[in-house]
Each structure stands twice: as structure tokens, then as C-alpha cells.
Amino acid sequence: MGQLNVIEGHYDASGLRFAILASRFNDFVVDRLISGSIDCILRHGGTKENITIVRVAGAMELPLVCKKLSLTSKFDGIIILGAIIRGSTPHFDYVASEATKGVVNVSLQTDVPIGFGVLTTDTIEQAIERAGSKAGNKGSDATLAVLESIRVIQKIS
């Protein structure tokens, strides 16, 4: 039996250019996600000069601006960050679903790796837990995912 050919990415941000696209809504959570993402890039060899932060109003604005960023060819990867917290109306379900679908479509259309770090939680406490306390930092997790995807795609290409 022959040996398997395994292609894996590695967490090396050196020489890579990133856009961190983040919503302003629920900024007390999103700002922590941004900090986690920046810290992750720097810990893995990236530089501040290769990080561009773009802010938009809310989650519904993320897909279009993500597409525009993808089409510039200025970025090796884009990290999408936001926090959608359930309220008492079905608005949460529509926003969470459409924002997610929109960002996935951008990635498939433009071939730019996207790390999706948009929290969808039932409570503010759950969001805070996922932005750097008990449940880690999902901004950092999304950044690791995009780093790995970039390096896997480089090996495949």
C-alpha cells in the first residue's frame, strides 16, 4: 500500500496581507474580536503594516464590503467579525442567515479565503464569553482558519 498524500496548511502569517472587516454594532464585543485577530496575526509572523481594518455598520453590510475588498486583489485573506445577539423578534434569524450566506458566496465567487468570526448568540453573556473569556476568542479562531486556508490553497495551486 502506498503512502497517502496529505496537504495541510500551517499558521504562518509572514508576508501575508489581511483585511479585518468588522461591524460596529455590538462594538463592546466586536472590538475584543478585532484584538484577538490582530494578536493572532502578529503572533504568527504577520506585521501591523499588512493589516487593514475596515468597519461597517452591522452584519448585513459585511457581504458587500467583503466582496469589494476581495476584488481589490490587495488582500491574501479577509477576516469577518461581528456579533449578532438574539432579541425578542425574528430579526436575528434573518440577519444571521443572510450575512452568513452572503459572505460564503463572496468566498466562492472570488477565491479569496475568508475567516468567518461573526458570533450568533442568544445572550450578551454568551457573546462576551466567545470574545476572549471562557470560550476563547473567536476572532483569533477565524484568523487561524483563514491562515490555514491561505496556505492550503497555496500548496494546491
Swiss-Prot record:
InterPro entries to which the protein is assigned, alphabetical: LS, LS/RS, LS/RS_sf
Cellular compartments per GO CC: cytosol; riboflavin synthase complex
Entry EC number(s): 2.5.1.78
Alphabetical list of Gene3D superfamilies matching this protein: Lumazine/riboflavin synthase
Entry GO MF terms: 6,7-dimethyl-8-ribityllumazine synthase activity
A Pfam family per the record: DMRL_synthase
Binding site for 5-amino-6-(D-ribitylamino)uracil: F25, A59, M60, E61, A83, I84, I85, F116
The keyword Zinc appears for this protein: no
Pathway noted in the entry: Cofactor biosynthesis; riboflavin biosynthesis; riboflavin from 2-hydroxy-3-oxobutyl phosphate and 5-amino-6-(D-ribitylamino)uracil: step 1/2
Top-rank lineage group of the source organism: Bacteria
Keywords per UniProt: Riboflavin biosynthesis, Transferase
One record GO biological process: riboflavin biosynthetic process
Kinase as UniProt keyword: no
Binding site for (2S)-2-hydroxy-3-oxobutyl phosphate: S88, T89, R130
Similarity annotation: Belongs to the DMRL synthase family.
Primary role: Catalyzes the formation of 6,7-dimethyl-8-ribityllumazine by condensation of 5-amino-6-(D-ribitylamino)uracil with 3,4-dihydroxy-2-butanone 4-phosphate. This is the penultimate step in the biosynthesis of riboflavin.
Protein name per the record: 6,7-dimethyl-8-ribityllumazine synthase
